[in-house]
Amino acid sequence: MRLADGTARRAATSTVTESIKADRRLPGPPPHGGRLISRLAHPDERDRWLAKVPHVPSVTLTAREVADIECLAVGAFSPLEGFLGKADYESVVADMRLASGLVWSLPVTLAATAEEVLGLKTGNDVVLRDPQGEPLAILHLEEIYAYDREEEAESVFRTSDTAHPGVAGLLAQGEWLLGGRVTVLRLPRGRPFVSYRLTP
């Protein structure tokens, strides 16, 4: 889009320059959904949660779920505050929208096996551990619900062929989904390209 005149161009340049001086970063587009979310715990809050970890049931995350935790922590998945509940999940799978109507193309889910959900209760908290067993986040468990993996594969990936890595991962995961907000205790360790990971 062409700016109408030199005055408008100078005003726009001045706005960007002042923003860079004040924040040391370029202004970006507004976050999806209009609100930037951060789920990373403040150090004091993190220490309180870490003291409770030995007394809270836990679930071990897959590599994909660990990546999702990072995106939830830094706001890359804004406006999501955690893993999808049933209404949002079903809406995303059927219509590529959250239940609110906001466009969202892929379900952000946390799967669990029947054995894992036996010790879990909605309204309670669950420690989410990385594949090495270290506490990564706390799930504030709001829902436990069943889902159809084959239906999700066909709807999201347009195939149920396990040669597709997304389908293979989906069909291998647990038969229950856990929904709820997360409090992220730390970002995942061993992340590649850390110098390029610029958070929103």
Segments and roles (model prediction):
Residues 1-200:
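Non-catalytic terminal extensions that flank enzyme cores
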